[in-house]
Each structure stands twice: as C-alpha cells, then as structure tokens.
Amino acid sequence: MHPPYTAPATEEAVTRVIEFFENLSPADVATIGQFYAPQARFKDPVNEVVGVPAIQGIFAHMFEALEQPRFVVTGRVVQGQQCFLTWDFLFAFKDFHKGVTQTVRGASHLVLDAQGQVTLHRDYWDAAEELYEKLPVVGALMRWLKKRANS
C-alpha cells in the first residue's frame, strides 16, 4: 500500500505556514486568516477553540504574556493533506526569570484543505514538564512529585 499522494501545492502551503510561524510578530496575528480556514479548530494542552478570531486571540495573548516568543521548526513530515511538525518554542517570562530564555519542545499535527488552509491545528507538548515545572511555586511541587514518582 502506498502512502497518500502529497501534491506540490500542499508542500508549498506547509512551507508558507512554517515561515509564518517562524517569523510571527504581534502585527502578524491579524493575518492568521490567510493561513487558516474560517472555522479552523485549534487545540493544545491549555486551549481548545474554533474559528480564526479565537485562534488570533490565543496568539495575541501569547505576545501579551511572554517576552520575545518565537517558534523554530525542527522537523516536518507531509503526507496527503496532513503534516506533522516538531518545534522548539522559545520565550522569556515577563514576571519572573526575566531575560532567561525558556524552551518548550513540542509537535503540531496540521490538516489542510484543498486551498492549502489549515482546518485543524493540534499541538502536543508536555505541560507539566515543559511549562509548569518552570513556574516558581507550582514548579517546585511538580519537581518534587516527579522525584517521588521516580524513586
């Protein structure tokens, strides 16, 4: 059995989405509709929304809450109308550990329509290890629980 054919247009659409996210700035949030279908679904460990305005809200909040957030795509697999991306999300907290670059490693599953727009964006990352352990009070508790579970 052969894998589904991946049209060159899908490869090009994925490349455009990657370039968009790797160069995302606060001003670019308003242009998300150029890459996402109107009723696109977005889900990650802390959000689940439908529609371009709601997706824009997630990324606008990211820029409000964090210093210099940016994505670096480290790998991609495109098959048919889907792709799977691995990435590093780099940022600094505004309220504590100021100026210290944090990294969250994760992956995204994207499904594109015939026009090359994202209809499903599902992010996978370990909220406990990648985020909560880096927070002052919660982080100490998470690290203690992890240590107890591993002993």
List where the protein language model places each region:
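A beta-strand edge to alpha-helix "cap/lid" segment located at domain peripheries
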Residues: 2, 64-70, 74-151
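Short, low-complexity N-terminal intrinsically disordered segments enriched in polar/charged residues
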Residues: 1-30, 34, 148-151
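Exposed alpha-helical structural elements
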Residues: 12, 16, 31, 54, ...
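A general secondary-structure boundary signal
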Residues: 14-15, 30-36, 86-88, 108-111
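A solvent-exposed, acidic/Ser-Thr-rich amphipathic alpha-helical stretch
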Residues: 29-33, 37-83
